[in-house]
């Protein structure tokens, strides 16, 4: 069924056309066909109803609006991207400043990483101080301090002898010397101290003030040693440790100075000798 507007137009054209002009119209599959010998028909323009055109206009506006919205979003996204890049660049500059110098300005910038950098710098100083503290302490003496200026010894402290103590072991604990302790306590035989005995121990001794030899005398006269008791003329030049052995005892037994035995056993812990352990004995050249 053709729209009413089309039918009306055809009726008007038929009334206005000359009698000699014949027009035939017929419907073929729902289309209007004009014969070839017929006069050219007037150009027909289909008028759309206002109701039908309104949705199309609105759709067009909606499409434009959507495009505009997309463009706006794209613009905003571009601006946001630029802003993000700018933010990253500034953040990078701030981090660089903090990392290089712990810059106070970097701290004002509120950069958390900058703050941590400052703390780390302080921590580094603390670490250096800690190293300094260790340097000031006796190498083996724990809390013992002394000889920081290579001239002044540490204080004299009291120590109550416990099972396993020897003067040699106490020298390592308190950065002292065997003969320094012996002289301070009038000990005739440095190899003999009693459990429960209270000793006065000079601590933190400077290297040049440590004395481990002057009070050690050979218990026997050994013709196999030199005059000073620093070496053996003939062997054996090794010894297998037995339970209860110590460098002091071995030195006295052989007519040697303890330090002479210590010197030929680098890396051996003389305070923790183990049974069946082999040590060296000094050989005269």
Curated annotation (Swiss-Prot):
Cited InterPro entries: LysM_dom, LysM_dom_sf
Species: Pyricularia oryzae (strain 70-15 / ATCC MYA-4617 / FGSC 8958) (Rice blast fungus)
Record-stated family: Belongs to the secreted LysM effector family.
Comp. bias intervals (Gly residues): 117-139
Secretion signal span: 1-16
UniProt keyword annotation of Repeat present: yes
Alphabetical list of SUPFAM superfamilies matching this protein: LysM domain
UniProt-recorded name of the protein: Secreted LysM effector slp2
Gene coding for it: slp2
Disruption phenotype: Does not affect the virulence and the proliferation of the fungus in plant tissue.
Record comment regarding domains: The LysM (lysin motif) domains are small globular domains involved in binding chitin in eukaryotes. Slp2 contains 2 LysM domains.
Keywords: Repeat, Signal, Virulence
Positions of the LysM domain: 157-201, 237-281
Function: Might have a role in sequestration of chitin oligosaccharides (breakdown products of fungal cell walls that are released during invasion and act as triggers of host immunity) to dampen host defense.
Stimuli inducing this protein: Expression does not seem to be up-regulated during plant infection.
Note in the entry: In plants, chitin acts as a microbe-associated molecular pattern (MAMP) that is recognized by lysin motif (LysM)-containing plant cell surface-localized pattern recognition receptors (PRRs) that activate a plethora of downstream immune responses.
Residue ranges of the region described as Disordered: 75-143
Composition-biased stretches (Basic and acidic residues): 85-116
Recorded superkingdom: Eukaryota
CDD domains attached to this UniProt entry: LysM
């Amino acid at each position: 069924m053709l729209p009413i507007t089309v039918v009306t137009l055809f009726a008007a054209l038929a009334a206005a056309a000359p009698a000699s002009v014949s027009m035939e119209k017929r419907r073929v599959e729902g289309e209007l066909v004009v014969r070839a010998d017929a006069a050219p028909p007037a150009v027909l323009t289909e008028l759309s109803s206002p109701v039908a055109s309104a949705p199309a206009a609105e759709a067009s506006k909606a499409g434009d609006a959507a495009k505009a919205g997309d463009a706006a979003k794209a613009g905003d996204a571009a601006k946001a991207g630029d802003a993000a890049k700018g933010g990253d660049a500034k953040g990078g500059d701030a981090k660089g400043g903090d990392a290089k110098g712990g810059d106070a300005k970097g701290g004002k910038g509120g950069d958390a990483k900058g703050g941590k950098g400052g703390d780390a710098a302080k921590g580094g100083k603390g670490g250096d101080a800690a190293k300094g503290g260790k340097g000031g302490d006796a190498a083996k003496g724990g809390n013992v301090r002394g000889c920081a200026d290579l001239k002044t010894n540490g204080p004299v402290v009291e120590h109550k002898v416990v099972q396993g103590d020897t003067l040699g072991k106490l020298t390592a604990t308190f950065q002292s010397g065997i003969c320094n302790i012996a002289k301070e306590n009038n000990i005739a035989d440095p190899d003999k101290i009693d459990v429960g005995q209270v000793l006065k121990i000079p601590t933190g001794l400077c290297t040049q003030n440590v004395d481990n030899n002057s009070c050690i005398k050979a218990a026997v006269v050994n013709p196999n040693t030199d005059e000073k008791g620093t070496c053996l003329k003939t062997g054996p030049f090794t010894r297998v440790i037995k339970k209860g052995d110590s460098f002091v005892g071995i030195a006295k037994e052989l007519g040697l100075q303890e330090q002479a035995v210590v010197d030929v056993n680098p890396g051996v812990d003389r305070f923790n000798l183990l049974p069946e352990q082999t040590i060296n004995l000094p050989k005269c050249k």
